[in-house]
């Protein structure tokens, strides 16, 4: 399905606006990472596709440099795809026969294909099964949101996984529509979260930057005129364990000549790899960050997320990396918290979570607030402490657990609506922490 032509955004997503991402440098980092990761992922055994992905801008730019193809030629080809809504670059005007022959022989828009699509009953969400060139499968989810012009949101629901963005929405019948696409970064996952089916697979392969971007391309085609407003890397895999490929994919998504999304419209979700969170702050500070926290204490978190049990991944180290990211990005991370009945949904858990997020925020702002060692504590009015917290940029997403086969082996069950509402109320009213329940997850069971 062709996507209607749109004017370039005013986001200034120039390809030279990223820190440390000049062509040859990022290409060298990528090749080094691939060699280092081969023993753990089996990527050495993945056969190359017959043609490379044209959505992998590092591959395209490197090929162009090596073969004397000018950057403007690439811009013309990408314009054919993203501005004129064509499904191929092969008929781009004003490109020499020699250059087009080289590009056609070596690249295709997509190396993957959608082999299954399941849609929710109300049509506002969908899950695509994407088959990679070597037969491996990943999942990509599209979540639709609508709101009235006065801001009341429906379908997606409050707290739906979306990045902050001020890009253009589609308006119809007094409502504003937007789509968020949730993409995978790996086949399988090494994190082993006890409630997640993907973790039972282990890590099978890292996706290339092109394969990550192709999921967004498939989603654009599925969404048609409404297009894709936001991208969240919350699908299969741990994005920060496939760092260089994810970084190149982020660059393509926000590249003015390619997907042209605002950097703040793209969010990377992580279970918490402190060293890589710092790297992301250095390399792409304007991209959103979401932390899959899921527990307010180290002991409980290590039980739910085995990857959090090491000394390098403690809550203390994680807090320091979050503060570093906030200093460079100017905004706090979104805190993802899957709520499981009887495991992490009590008022005590909610208050521990409020204290944890509160301490993190205070430590980040302590130079601005003298004479206080606790949020809303002695010497500070409750209202004043709440206002500072609300301005911090941190946001807690309370996500109802969706039953899975692996979760059932641990006796995990979905929480009651009352428990979710109580947790949100405690965080908001007692701690001044912004918190919402992602009710759309209930709807996500359909797909």
Regions found by a protein language model. Name each.
Residues 2-179:
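Flexible, acidic/Gly-rich N-terminal and inter-domain linker regions that tether
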Residues 424, 428-447:
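C-terminal accessory regions of radical SAM enzymes
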Residues 220-427:
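Conserved AdoMet/S-adenosylmethionine-binding subsite of the radical SAM
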Residues 70, 78, 173, 203, ...:
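Post-transit mature-domain signature of plant chloroplast proteins, especially small thylakoid membrane
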Residues 148-158, 163-166, 173-218:
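Canonical Radical SAM [4Fe-4S] cluster-binding loop centered on the CxxxCxxC motif
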Residues 120, 184-185, 269, 292:
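Short linear Ser/Thr-Pro motifs
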Residues 120-129, 151, 277-278, 343-345, ...:
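Short, solvent-exposed polar/charged micro-motifs at secondary-structure junctions
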């Amino acid at each position: 399905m062709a996507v209607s032509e749109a004017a370039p955004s005013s986001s200034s997503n120039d390809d030279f606006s990223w820190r440390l991402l000049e062509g040859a440098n990022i290409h060298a980092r990528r090749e080094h990472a691939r060699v280092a990761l081969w023993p753990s992922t089996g990527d050495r055994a993945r056969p190359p596709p017959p043609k490379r992905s044209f959505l992998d801008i590092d591959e395209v730019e490197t090929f162009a440099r090596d073969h004397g193809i000018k950057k403007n030629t690439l811009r013309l080809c990408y314009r054919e795809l993203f501005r004129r809504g064509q499904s191929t670059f092969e008929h781009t005007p004003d490109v020499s026969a020699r250059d087009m022959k080289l590009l056609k022989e070596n690249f295709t828009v997509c190396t993957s294909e959608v082999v299954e699509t399941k849609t929710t009953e109300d049509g506002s969400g969908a899950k695509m099964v994407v088959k990679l060139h070597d037969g491996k499968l990943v999942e990509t989810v599209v979540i639709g949101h609508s709101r009235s012009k006065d801001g009341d949101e429906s379908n997606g629901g409050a707290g739906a996984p979306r990045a902050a963005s001020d890009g253009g929405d589609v308006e119809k019948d007094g409502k504003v529509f937007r789509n968020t696409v949730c993409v995978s970064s790996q086949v399988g996952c090494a994190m082993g979260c006890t409630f997640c089916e993907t973790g039972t697979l282990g890590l099978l392969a890292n996706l290339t930057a092109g394969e990550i971007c192709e999921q967004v391309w498939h989603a654009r085609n599925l969404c048609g005129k409404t297009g894709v407003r936001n991208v969240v890397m919350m699908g299969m895999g741990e994005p920060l364990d496939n760092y260089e490929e994810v970084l190149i994919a982020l660059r393509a998504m926000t590249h003015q000549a390619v997907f042209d999304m605002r950097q703040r419209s793209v969010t990377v979700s992580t279970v918490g790899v402190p060293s890589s969170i710092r790297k992301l702050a250095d390399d792409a500070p304007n991209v959103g960050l979401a932390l899959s926290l899921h527990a307010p204490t180290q002991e409980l978190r290590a039980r739910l997320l085995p990857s959090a049990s090491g000394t390098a991944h403690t809550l203390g180290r994680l807090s320091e990396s979050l503060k570093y990211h906030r200093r460079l990005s100017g905004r706090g991370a979104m805190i993802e918290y899957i709520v499981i009945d009887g495991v992490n949904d009590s008022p005590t858990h909610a208050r521990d979570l409020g204290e944890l997020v509160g301490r993190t925020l205070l430590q980040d702002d302590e130079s601005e607030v003298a004479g206080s060692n606790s949020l809303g504590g002695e010497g500070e009015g409750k209202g004043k402490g709440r206002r500072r917290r609300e301005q911090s940029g941190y946001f807690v997403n309370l996500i109802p657990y969706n039953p899975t086969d692996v979760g059932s082996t641990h006796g995990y069950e979905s929480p009651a609506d009352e428990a979710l509402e109580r947790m949100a109320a405690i965080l908001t009213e007692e701690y001044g922490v912004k918190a919402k329940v992602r009710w759309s997850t209930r709807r996500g069971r359909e797909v």
